[in-house]
Amino acid sequence: VWLLGSSLFSAQLAAMLGLPFAFASHFAPDYLMRALEVYRAQYRPSAAWPKPYAMVGVNVFAADTDDEARRLFTSLQQQFINLRRGTPGKLPPPVDVLEANELELANVAHSLSFAAVGSRDTVRDKLRDRIAQTGADELIITAQIYDHAARLRSFELAAQIRDELASERR
């Protein structure tokens, strides 16, 4: 059993119950670092989990080039903008230019600021930084990519990156 949350309360609850904690930083990064700090500081060991164990969520959009990955990422950006406008719907196809005002662009950039978007090397470096920044024991990744083949390619690249980063930690 895990506790998934995006608040300080969820971090406190996971700590109190001696559960592993997954933080939803893939859409709510604001309290990530403080939540991990609270979780680790207040952790009460349990029989199954003698020490705190943290996972953080990351949107991963990996492609053969940074430009291609940034274009794929526009689907998720549009979805967030549409949600904030009160017009939720299916994941839209990627676009060359986002149709949004400055405030909407700033809000979506903030909400998705923990994402790793780019080529294999760019994403690897970003994920390495995210692990170092958070001290996460695991990452849970998601990729809301419109095109199925591009989504599969992103996960293939992510798996290669996982293997490379795991070998660095040994």
Predicted regions and their residues:
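An alpha-helical appendage that flanks or caps ligand/catalytic pockets
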Residues: 30-136, 163-169
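Internal, glycine-rich beta/alpha segment that forms the wall or movable "lid"
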Residues: 1-17, 33-34
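Generic C-terminus detector
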Residues: 131-170
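Hydrophobic faces of well-ordered beta-strands that scaffold small-molecule active sites
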Residues: 1-4, 21-24, 52-59, 139-141
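Glycine-enriched alpha-helix->loop->beta-strand junction motifs that scaffold or abut catalytic
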Residues: 13-22, 135
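Active-site-proximal loop/turn and secondary-structure-junction residues that shape catalytic pockets
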Residues: 27, 60-62, 145-147
